[in-house]
Amino acid sequence: MPEPAKSAPAPKKGSKKAVTKTQKKGDKKRRKTRKESYSIYVYKVLKQVHPDTGISSKAMGIMNSFVNDIFERIAGEASRLAHYNKRSTITSREIQTAVRLLLPGELAKHAVSEGTKAVTKYTSSK
């Protein structure tokens, strides 16, 4: 009985090899879509606080989700405050009040002082 022809072994489940396609004459090379994240900023802050410490990609993903979540909460609360006061602009005052409402006690105080410091630095550099 003849043996069936052996084909190339099937790639293992979860294999990470990319399938490359040959380019035709008229095709343009596809660009990788940009994915925005806060990872470079999280990394810069980490190096300021703990210069000898690294961070895994999983931990960076968690930090990115955390920053996005806090941003959305503050923006939403600031928007609500502006709406309540019949204002069409979100100012630093709305942001500050939103931070005071969202963050607990000492954390809110530190966040407000750091935010005020950042705004002062920005306006003085103009």
UniProtKB/Swiss-Prot annotation:
Location of region: Disordered: 1-35
State any single GO MF term.
structural constituent of chromatin
GO CC list? nucleosome; nucleus
Residues carrying Phosphoserine: 15
Q: Where is the cross-link described as Glycyl lysine isopeptide (Lys-Gly) (interchain with G-Cter in ubiquitin)? A: 121
Start-end of Low complexity biased regions:
1-12
Q: Which UniProt keywords apply?
A: Acetylation, Chromosome, DNA-binding, Glycoprotein, Isopeptide bond, Nucleosome core, Nucleus, Phosphoprotein, Ubl conjugation
Q: Where in the cell is it found?
A: Nucleus; Chromosome
Task: Spell out the Gene3D superfamilies in the cross-references.
Answer: Histone, subunit A
PTM-bearing positions, type N6-acetyllysine: 6, 13, 16, 21
Primary localization: nucleus
State the superkingdom: Eukaryota
**PANTHER family, A to Z:** HISTONE H2B (PTHR23428)
Q: How does it assemble?
A: The nucleosome is a histone octamer containing two molecules each of H2A, H2B, H3 and H4 assembled in one H3-H4 heterotetramer and two H2A-H2B heterodimers. The octamer wraps approximately 147 bp of DNA.
Instruction: Report the function annotation for this chain.
Output: Core component of nucleosome. Nucleosomes wrap and compact DNA into chromatin, limiting DNA accessibility to the cellular machineries which require DNA as a template. Histones thereby play a central role in transcription regulation, DNA repair, DNA replication and chromosomal stability. DNA accessibility is regulated via a complex set of post-translational modifications of histones, also called histone code, and nucleosome remodeling.
Q: Which family does it belong to?
A: Belongs to the histone H2B family.
Protein name from the UniProt record: Histone H2B 8
Per the record, the gene is H2B-VIII
